């Protein structure tokens, strides 16, 4: 299911992913849920829940709510995780190794099909799921010979190498990058980049911890 990027805010997509894991948890003991119940778990308003979901269609039944199983299927379809999406990791340092060795981090709908690094001492080594670490310069050849689409990369190199590595990935056909570095990438508007900065999230968490009103 595809939508025009300008029509949907990043916040809506972020909440959509939260709805999904909440629904999967609630599904263990309930078959249906309404917007009020979902909003309480999400700590938002029922109006916000209805607005978010109505962005993609009319899925609920007035006075009854949502069939949880069906809503999960719909959200997975919207997020494109109702099928397997191939992903490569570029940079097999501590972060890259952590991701490649713990597939649960990726969740449903994603599989690592290639790992790349520029360190000659790492190239050729076989790691998780019998994947061989390849030379980062071989990304284009790998994509061309792989049986299936590979246009998403997890960038886990050191900050100083991030921009150059990202540019090379784009040049070799990568269209979407999960940026695990703390460097703000400057790429074309046709390239999708999502930044994951753990330190920034900890800073955000710490602010709210320090400024949380006592009840």
Language-model regions, residue ranges each:
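Phosphate-bearing ligand-interacting subdomains
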Residues: 19-27, 130-215
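Extreme N-terminal segment that seeds HTH/winged-HTH DNA-binding domains in transcriptional regulators
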Residues: 1-32
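A glycine-biased structural micro-motif
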Residues: 121-125, 148-150
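A short secondary-structure junction signal
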Residues: 100-102, 127-128, 165
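Glycine-rich adenosine-cofactor-binding loop
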Residues: 82-122
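HTH-adjacent hinge/linker in prokaryotic transcriptional regulators
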Residues: 32, 36, 41-84
């Amino acid at each position: 299911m595809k939508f025009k990027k300008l029509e949907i805010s990043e916040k809506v997509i972020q909440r959509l992913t939260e709805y999904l894991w909440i629904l999967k948890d609630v599904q263990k003991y309930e078959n249906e849920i309404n917007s009020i119940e979902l909003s309480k778990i999400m700590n938002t308003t029922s109006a916000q829940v209805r607005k978010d979901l109505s962005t993609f269609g009319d899925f609920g039944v007035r006075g009854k709510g949502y069939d949880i199983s069906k809503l999960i299927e719909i959200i997975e379809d919207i997020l494109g995780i109702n099928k397997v999406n191939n992903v490569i990791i570029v940079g097999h340092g501590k972060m890259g190794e952590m991701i490649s060795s713990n597939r649960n981090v990726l969740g449903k709908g994603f599989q690592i099909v290639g790992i790349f690094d520029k360190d000659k001492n790492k190239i050729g080594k076989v790691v998780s799921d019998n994947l061989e670490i390849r030379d980062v310069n071989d990304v284009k050849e790998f994509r061309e010979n792989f049986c299936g689409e590979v246009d998403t990369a997890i960038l886990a190199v050191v900050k100083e190498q991030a921009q150059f590595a990202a540019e090379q990935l784009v040049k070799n056909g990568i269209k979407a990058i999960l940026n695990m570095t703390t460097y703000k990438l400057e790429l074309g508007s046709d390239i999708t980049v999502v930044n994951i900065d753990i330190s920034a999230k900890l800073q955000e968490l710490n602010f709210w911890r320090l400024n949380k009103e006592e009840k």
